[in-house]
Structures are given as C-alpha cells and as structure tokens.
C-alpha cells in the first residue's frame, strides 16, 4: 500500500542518517562520521581537487591497514566531479552514454541527499570497519486500539525496526 511504502521509505531515510551521523545519545546510533578519522592528506597534489581528496582519503585508509571499499558523497558534490572537463571540453570521468554505476578510483560511489554531506565525503573500508546488526526488519503496524483511537474513529500507524551499529575500526573511515 501507499502508506506502507511511504513509512518504509521514511524509515530507511532516518536509518541512513543514524548510520552516518548518529550521535550515540539516548536511542540514537553512534554513527560512522562522528567516529571517522579526520582527513589528512599524506602529501600535497598540484592543483588538488575533490578527485584528489578522495584518492588521498583512500591512501589514508590504506595506511591505517584498511583498504577502502567505497565513497559516500552528496549528490551535488558527485555531480561536480562527474562534470569536470578537460581543456577540450571532454568529460574526464563521466561518459554520458555509459550505463555503468558510479565509481571513482575503482570503488563504488554512493550518492546521498543528506544535506549534512554537502561539501564533505566519507571514504572507508565499510565491510571491515563497521557492522550493522539488524535484529528486526522494518515492519508497519496499524492499530485502532491505541489509547482512545477507537472512540475518536482514528488509527495509529507505527513503522519501526531494531538495528545496532558497531564501528569496530574507526580508523577505517576518513
């Protein structure tokens, strides 16, 4: 149903925010970003740009003994990278006719709409550095027996899941 789909979509959005940015207080997860290592380039690159930053973040993770497996970027930042052109106006990375998924330096890129990611990135060894425990998958429950819903001719809808996040190796993320 539409209600079920909307509730699950909203829950997944909140889950993404918690996994990435949760502050660990109360019922909040302790997200990856607050625990990640601060980006520190091992060396400077001439005319350094976002593409260079992501490669240097991969190096930083590698030097911490956790080879990166992916990047997370805001939609706008990823579009800026894809639209970089050479002096002849040719796209450096993107091939508008290609049907391949987004990748950079051989790693998948996950673009997010989270406004907190604008101008930032997360590069890391996602499979080795963190683990998501999913105790209860998303479920939607509809009830008329909540408090006085029956008398008021109302229904209550709840969508929830139970997850925990263990960032076992914070140094695996930059």
Residue ranges of each PLM-predicted region?
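Structured, hydrophobic secondary-structure cores that serve as assembly/anchoring elements
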Residues: 1-174
